[in-house]
């Protein structure tokens, strides 16, 4: 089995993303997402997903230079517009904001729309737990698998993630989805 060093993955992912219009910082952050997912053995949301993201960038389906913006704020609840930006960067920004709101109000909820695939949803549960917050994250998807006993794609994977900080360096974490990733 071919082994690629984590640092080499980040460097190459970043190089390709910068060549497709990402800023240096956003390319580094996005490359880290791909490499960490691969490092954790979630290749479907790491190295195996990368060619598809490059294809989407080349087709203009992902806009590499946009930043999600808050469209509506109601105290502890906000709705954000992703502007077809890169899903993991938008989702990280949304979770950062949800944690800020939670620390201010005791709860923080951010809905993010018009974004791209957020990759491994569990990343944002960990992000919340590492910030000392309980993270509950979910997403809807396009139909990508058949219902039990069927052949045609009728249901989405629709992941649900929960993460709770237990102590300074430990969290209770559950990443559920309808198929094996």
Located regions from the model:
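Generic N-terminal amphipathic, Lys/Arg-enriched alpha-helix
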Residues: 1-20
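N-terminal glycine-rich anion-binding loops that anchor highly charged ligand groups
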Residues: 2-5, 22-48, 62-73
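Active-site cofactor/substrate anionic-group-binding motifs, chiefly glycine-
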Residues: 46-99
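A glycine- and small-aliphatic-rich helix-loop capping segment at beta-alpha/alpha-beta transitions
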Residues: 59, 126-135, 151-158
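Solvent-exposed alpha-helices and their adjacent loops that cap or buttress functional pockets
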Residues: 70-73, 102-104, 129, 152-156, ...
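A glycine-rich phosphate/pyrophosphate-binding beta-strand-loop-alpha-helix module
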Residues: 92, 96, 100-138
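Phosphate/diphosphate-binding glycine-rich loops and adjacent basic-rich segments that engage nucleotide
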Residues: 145-181
């Amino acid at each position: 089995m071919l082994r690629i060093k984590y640092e080499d993955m980040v460097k190459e992912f970043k190089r390709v993303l910068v060549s497709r219009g990402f800023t240096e910082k956003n390319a580094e952050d996005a490359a880290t997402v791909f490499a960490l997912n691969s490092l954790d053995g979630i290749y479907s949301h790491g190295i195996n997903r990368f060619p598809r993201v490059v294809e989407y960038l080349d087709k203009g389906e992902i806009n590499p230079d946009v930043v999600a913006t808050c469209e509506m704020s109601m105290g502890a609840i906000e709705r954000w517009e992703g502007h077809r930006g890169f899903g993991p960067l938008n989702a990280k920004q949304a979770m950062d904001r949800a944690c800020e709101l939670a620390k201010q109000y005791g709860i923080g909820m951010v809905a993010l729309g018009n974004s791209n695939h957020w990759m491994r949803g569990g990343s944002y549960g960990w992000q919340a737990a590492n910030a000392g917050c309980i993270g509950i994250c979910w997403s809807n998807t396009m139909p990508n698998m058949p219902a039990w006993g069927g052949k045609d794609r009728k249901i989405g994977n629709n992941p649900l993630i929960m993460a709770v900080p237990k102590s300074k360096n430990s969290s209770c974490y559950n990443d559920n989805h309808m198929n094996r990733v």
